Amino acid sequence: MRTSNYLLSTLKETPNDAEVVSHQLMLRAGMIRKLASGLYTWLPTGLRVLRKVENIVRQEIDNAGAVETLMPVVQPFELWEETGRSEKMGPELLRFTDRHVRPFVLSPTAEEVITSLVRNEVSSYKQLPLNLYQIQTKFRDERRPRFGVMRAREFCMMDAYSFDIDKAGLEKSYQAMHDAYCKAFDRMGLEYRPVLADSGAIGGSGSQEFHVLADSGEDLIAFSTESDYAANIEKAEALAPAVERAEPTQEMTLVDTPNAKTIAELVEQHGLPIEKTVKTLFVKASDEIDAPIIALIVRGDHELNEVKAENLPQVASPLEMASEEEIRELIGAGPGSLGPVGLELPFIVDRSVAVMSDFGAGANIDGKHYFGINWGRDVELGQVEDLRNVVEGDPSPCGKGTLMLKRGIEVGHIFQLGNVYSEAMNCSVLGPDGKNVILEMGCYGIGVSRVVASAIEQNHDKYGIIWPDAIAPFQVAIVPMNMHKSERVKEAAEKLYAELTAMGIEVLFDDRKERPGVMFSDIELIGIPHTIVIGDRSMDEGNFEYKNRRTGEKTPVAMADIVEHVKSQLK
């Protein structure tokens, strides 16, 4: 490809509204342009990368035995009503009506559509297992689109759906897709981790996310220092402390704390160690209990894990914190002065809190706390659960090593759905015994456009993008110095361009009438892995200059050897 025939569209300055590196560089490198909030046009350079990611994903998913299909972006609303997700998805599900006032949605995912297809097309266990996938545009009406294509409203996604006669078949399909994901991300040259995850709005049981490791990642991931265990912060289990609760050494005393409305203020003003304090958080209760709200108690230096809390049967879903007005009406005190002693509402205690002694908590009286609280003596312990986020140094749930935390960007997710959707939509086949069997489903997604941004977050320097070879927009750049003034430079560049392209190598030939500095800056910004510089000075010595984008190393290479040298560098 010649730059004279190409829409390069690079920018010198970083746009003000671009927050993360990938967004900044995708705009500056001419990969995308913003059309509206969360909506982007993919320019030629960006599209080349996107297609390469798509092709790698397609090849590995094909190799796993899945079959490609293509489903409509527009879906009938009634399908979403069948599964009950029409309300669960909330405002992210964009609804509209056609000219006949029939309700539709823009597809954020396709479980309903694929289940409807399979229930109409598959009737016997002999047609199973079956795994269908598509690479298609999706739309989620994000409340706050940000970070460019990382959290856009419209995005490209690979979504696959497996159908099996039993759980053993589902587990086999799930493992095949897990392995396919690993092969795809390995080929892309990404540093990633598959981690245990919560199933969230999709539903089902087993679930893993695939995260590209990057400091800009929105998600926290917990890893064992001595095993392959990894889980996102929502799923990572905080084990019960391996110590017994100490015997009381203090009497419970009521203390005036008028200026201590937070844990930090309590610690600072009264000298109480933060690990000797607890936070009492009130959330809306479910119909499982005869109370409007329920208290969740965690240690003062720990954070409530909202996903773990929401998964408790006594807690309403979605999780909703009780308002100060509701708390005051029931207890007579406000946030900052709440605790378990004398509390006449149900409460659940975190595992770390259950082993505490001589601790401090609100007295359920404004401006007062109890110090020296002990379970059993001053208040009954009751129900104990894992309620908190893990912290670095916690013992790993696998029993090996401790946990360390890193940030990651979720680029893929796999679920063992079971029969959540197939049962709701009556998707069944005749089994070997002639009886109807509800199918076991798996669903699998890769955010193709998000992979592009994630790769940049992991591969860049102050000059621009450093693409892994497999997903670079071009493999090689040819930069001729003053080509329009030197006939021999032009001839050498044209000859090399013809040779490399004839071999199937993707080349960007910078034939612009531009200063060398501008040409070099653009090539580095775009991130092409291998650059060949052709100039009169090096040709006088019988050489071209080869430059590796990742290492920055420059190497003189004999003109006669340049093609073989380039071939040896390509991965």
Swiss-Prot record:
Principal cellular location given in the protein's record: cytoplasm
InterPro entries the UniProt entry points to: aa-tRNA-synt_IIb (IPR002314), aa-tRNA-synth_II (IPR006195), aa-tRNA-synth_II/BPL/LPL (IPR045864), Anticodon-bd (IPR004154), Anticodon-bd_dom_sf (IPR036621), Pro-tRNA-ligase_IIa (IPR002316), Pro-tRNA-synth_IIa_bac-type (IPR004500), Pro-tRNA-Synthase_IIa_type1 (IPR023717)
Transmembrane segment boundaries: none
Signal peptide residue numbers: none
CDD domains xrefs: ProRS-INS (cd04334), ProRS_anticodon_short (cd00861), ProRS_core_prok (cd00779)
Molecular function via GO: aminoacyl-tRNA deacylase activity; ATP binding; proline-tRNA ligase activity
Compartment(s): Cytoplasm
EC number: 6.1.1.15
Pfam family, one: tRNA_edit
UniProt comment concerning the protein's domains: Consists of three domains: the N-terminal catalytic domain, the editing domain and the C-terminal anticodon-binding domain.
Subunit and partners: Homodimer.
Name listed for the protein in its UniProt record: Proline--tRNA ligase
Organism: Vibrio parahaemolyticus serotype O3:K6 (strain RIMD 2210633)
Taxonomic lineage from the root: Bacteria, Pseudomonadati, Pseudomonadota, Gammaproteobacteria, Vibrionales
